[in-house]
């Protein structure tokens, strides 16, 4: 008789509860699955510590193995403000050209064909990225690969952007006739075809990336060609806005990047000298004053991304924005003849969207970022409203937690906690990741402190003193002992792409402190 056995089990539990004065009560029999679901779950957690309950969620949902409840509008707004403060952003970016939700392949291909005739030249279809975001995505994937090599678990690895694959070599192939995805930055060897090395093959770029706290790409702001004098009629102008750099960031390296196609026809055997100049001063009736920044000598048959060092002028533009008058590019053949950049295979703003010229700068913070202190009055009001409804639940919990039973408490350990940028409604400006496993520490630091608790010597001494004077000395606290950084790739208000490292964002290990 299964019903009689279940009834006897509950009677034994109640008898133990009545006799609790003689010792701790036995564990309550497990609830059925339906009853457990009705009891509710923890927000974005893995169940936490036994004996600790949460307020039943109004509408629990499950995503990626996490049980959570739908946030109210005010709660969501408060959480957005707090996370933006952690990210060092004064407000939510609203880029002009943000991201759109991915669509099924058949529908996406149909819409792309319909919109291809309406898009301005050089503009990508919805859901696709230009050359600068693609390059930044390669940098992000390189950082994510480094994090994986450091031993991060599967639950802690950041999720790549769904619109593009995890790496350049795995990115889906474009339709015939379309531009190839960005998969290299250096010039390819003559006759090497469309294959090539990864954008991070050079040791210099790897050093820049490892040393930087933030990487930022800038789009070319020039929309129309400027008329130059006959001597400079083939010059091309580029301008970038560096006025929105966060305070405390110093430029460690900066590059101007422009794509070169293979040259055929009358210039197929030619060698070109490509020069990049800083515009020092503009004049109405004569040529502008120029300062040579960098040069490259290339063959007509070479193809790939050209890089020019503009670190010096970038630092000047950040410190004194009024001196930012842009760059000029010139192309000269080995015979000393000035030619149009298009004749040398250089792709301008009218070229394919994934071959647009852009600028990238590496930054390192010169001072520690301090979060802005904001008023918590709204949270206090919300807490005061909930305090009366939670007081009875807290009383019931405390009555059970008063028992010093090892079965009712768990040792200090790491628990799962996932932060979803998509659930916060930020999928239009955060390129990657969709979210990350932040995790948290919780549990008891009771005597004896085992080796797996990662206790400090001070925590061991504090535990011993707590045993002698529990009213005056508290137990050690369960806190993170190892924290990892994450990288976030996002658009700013000017549609520039920023790759930023945020330290101490992921809990890797916990211990008693």
Swiss-Prot record:
Residues 1-20 form the signal peptide. Residues 158-172 have a biased composition (Polar residues). SMART domains: TGFB. It comes from Homo sapiens. One of its GO terms (biological process) is immune response. This is Bone morphogenetic protein 6. It is linked to Iron overload: A disorder of iron homeostasis with incomplete and age-dependent penetrance. It is characterized by adult onset of increased hepatic and systemic iron levels, increased serum ferritin, normal or high transferrin saturation, and inappropriately low or normal levels of hepcidin. The severity of the phenotype depends on age, sex, as well as additional genetic or acquired factors including alcohol consumption and increased body weight. The lineage of its organism: Eukaryota, Metazoa, Chordata, Craniata, Vertebrata. Glycans are attached at residues 241, 269, 386, 404, 454. Growth factor of the TGF-beta superfamily that plays essential roles in many developmental processes including cartilage and bone formation. Also plays an important role in the regulation of HAMP/hepcidin expression and iron metabolism by acting as a ligand for hemojuvelin/HJV. Also acts to promote expression of HAMP, potentially via the interaction with its receptor BMPR1A/ALK3. Initiates the canonical BMP signaling cascade by associating with type I receptor ACVR1 and type II receptor ACVR2B. Residues 98-121 have a biased composition (Low complexity). The gene is BMP6. Glycosylated at Asn-454. Glycosylation is crucial for recognition by the activin receptor type I/ACVR1. Disulfide bonds join 412-478, 441-510, 445-512.
């Amino acid at each position: 008789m299964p019903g009689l056995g279940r009834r006897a089990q509950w009677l034994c539990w109640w008898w133990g509860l009545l006799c609790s004065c003689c010792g701790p009560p036995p564990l309550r029999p497990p609830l059925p699955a339906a009853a457990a679901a009705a009891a509710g779950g923890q927000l974005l957690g893995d169940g936490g510590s036994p004996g600790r309950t949460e307020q039943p969620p109004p509408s629990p949902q499950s995503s990626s193995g996490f049980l959570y409840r739908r946030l109210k509008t005010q709660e969501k707004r408060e959480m957005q403000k707090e996370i933006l403060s952690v990210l060092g952003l004064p407000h939510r970016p609203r880029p002009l050209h943000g991201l759109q939700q991915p669509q099924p392949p058949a529908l996406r291909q149909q819409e792309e064909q319909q919109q291809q005739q309406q898009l301005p030249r050089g503009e990508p279809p919805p859901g696709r990225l230009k050359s600068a975001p693609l390059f930044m995505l390669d940098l992000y994937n390189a950082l994510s690969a480094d994090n994986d090599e450091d031993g991060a678990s599967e639950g802690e690895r950041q999720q790549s952007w769904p619109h593009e694959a995890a790496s350049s070599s795995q990115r889906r192939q474009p339709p015939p006739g379309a531009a190839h995805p960005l998969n290299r930055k250096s010039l390819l060897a003559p006759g090497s075809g469309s294959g090539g090395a990864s954008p991070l093959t050079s040791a210099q770029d790897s050093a820049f990336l490892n040393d930087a706290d933030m990487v930022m790409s800038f789009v070319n702001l020039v929309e129309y060609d400027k008329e130059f004098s006959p001597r400079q009629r083939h010059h091309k102008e580029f301008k970038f806005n560096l006025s929105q750099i966060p305070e405390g960031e110093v430029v460690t390296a900066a590059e101007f990047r422009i794509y070169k196609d293979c040259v055929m026809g009358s210039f197929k055997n030619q060698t070109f000298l490509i020069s990049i100049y800083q515009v020092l001063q503009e004049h109405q009736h004569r040529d502008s004053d120029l300062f040579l920044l960098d040069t490259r000598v290339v063959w007509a048959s070479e193809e790939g991304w050209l890089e020019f060092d503009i670190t010096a002028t970038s630092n000047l533009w950040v410190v004194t924005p009024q001196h930012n008058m842009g760059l000029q590019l010139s192309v000269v053949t080995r015979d000393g003849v000035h030619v149009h950049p298009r004749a040398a295979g250089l792709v301008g703003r009218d070229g394919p969207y994934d071959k647009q010229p852009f600028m990238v700068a590496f930054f390192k913070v010169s001072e520690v970022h301090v979060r802005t202190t904001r008023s918590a009055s709204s949270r206090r009001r919300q807490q005061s409203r909930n305090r009366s409804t939670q007081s009875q639940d807290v009383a019931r919990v405390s009555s059970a937690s008063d028992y010093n039973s090892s079965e009712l408490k768990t040792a200090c350990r790491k628990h799962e906690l996932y932060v979803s940028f998509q659930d916060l409604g930020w999928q239009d400006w955060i390129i990657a990741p969709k979210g990350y496993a932040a995790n948290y520490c919780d549990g008891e630091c009771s005597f004896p402190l085992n080796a797996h608790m990662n206790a400090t010597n001070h925590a061991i001494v504090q535990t011993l003193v707590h045993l002698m004077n529990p009213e005056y000395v508290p137990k050690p606290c369960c806190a993170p002992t190892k924290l990892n950084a994450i990288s976030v790739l996002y658009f700013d208000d000017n549609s520039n792409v920023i790759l930023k490292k945020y330290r101490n964002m992921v809990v890797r290990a916990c211990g008693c402190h």
